[in-house]
Regions:
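Glycine-rich phosphate/diphosphate-binding loop of Rossmann-like nucleotide-binding domains
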Residues: 12-61, 65
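Charged, often glycine-rich, active-site loop that binds/positions anionic groups
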Residues: 67-80
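N-terminal presequence-like segments and the immediate start of the first folded domain
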Residues: 1-21, 113, 189-193, 207-209, ...
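Conserved acidic residues
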Residues: 131-133
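C-terminal binding/interaction regions
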Residues: 136, 145-222
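Short glycine-rich, flexible loops that bind phosphorylated cofactors or substrates
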Residues: 141-143
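Intrinsically disordered, low-complexity domain-flanking/linker segments in eukaryotic proteins
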Residues: 77-129
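Solvent-exposed alpha-helices and their adjacent loops that cap or buttress functional pockets
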Residues: 13-17, 122-128, 161-165
Length: 222
């Protein structure tokens, strides 16, 4: 648990994430810590109403790859959205088109059938661009400068992606001096006094996702 005044304030009011699409990308280094953080993140997202089918999880080898992966995930979600919108537009414009013999050709139905076959076996869920993406990693200081270089590069990289794309990026990178600090921040320390920061990241993603939608419409959401 947090001591003193340190820790996140509870979001006010509680935000409803049922309409959101959230991305998660996590490194695979320090898997015990990462797995617990991922569980905490998902727990928080589900508690806020985010549907499992609207959560996309990707993995990368290490934390250094997180900024690139976040950017590419967001671009991929934009591509999905454009493809879906384009298919709907074609179907709508061709509905009820009359042929030269005066009969009515239902091209919309044909297009819909082809689209269903194309999507067969694909994951169900929203194809909207991500409302927020959570980047999860855990760096533990060693005997070289590797820790400092990676921490700095990833921190600046994630901020740059957030500002360049306009997609909210939740900073889920733990920069740890010891393994014990990581266990505590993943809520799996032996003493049981830790707090799973993944729960905070999930709540932050929902809040930012809801506010981002409001801001894009000129509305200030509390």
């Amino acid at each position: 648990m947090f001591e003193g005044i340190k820790g996140p304030g509870a979001p006010q009011p509680h935000h409803n994430g049922s309409a959101l699409r959230i991305g998660i990308v996590h490194a695979r280094w320090n898997d015990q810590i990462i797995s617990a953080l991922l569980d905490g993140t998902l727990k928080s997202l589900h508690a806020a109403g985010v549907k499992q089918e609207n959560i996309v999880i990707q993995t990368v080898p290490g934390s250094y790859e997180l900024p690139y992966a976040v950017r590419q995930m967001y671009l991929a979600s934009q591509t999905q959205h454009a493809a879906t919108a384009g298919g709907s537009l074609v179907a709508g414009s061709s509905s009820g088109t009359a042929d030269l013999l005066g009969s009515s050709t239902n091209l919309a139905g044909l297009a819909a059938g082809q689209q269903e076959k194309k999507e067969e076996g694909e994951t169900k869920g929203s194809k909207e661009p991500f409302d927020a993406i959570i980047a999860i990693g855990a760096l533990i200081k060693g005997s070289t400068m590797h820790f400092e270089y990676i921490s700095d590069a990833v921190s600046h990289g994630l901020m740059r992606v957030q500002l360049d794309t306009g997609c909210a990026v939740v900073f889920g990178l733990l920069t740890l001096l010891t393994e014990e600090q990581g266990l505590e921040r993943a809520g799996i320390d032996a003493a049981g006094k830790g707090h799973n920061h993944g729960e905070d990241w999930g709540a932050a993603a929902v809040e930012l996702g809801v506010k981002r939608r409001g801001w894009s419409e000129g509305v200030f959401v509390q």
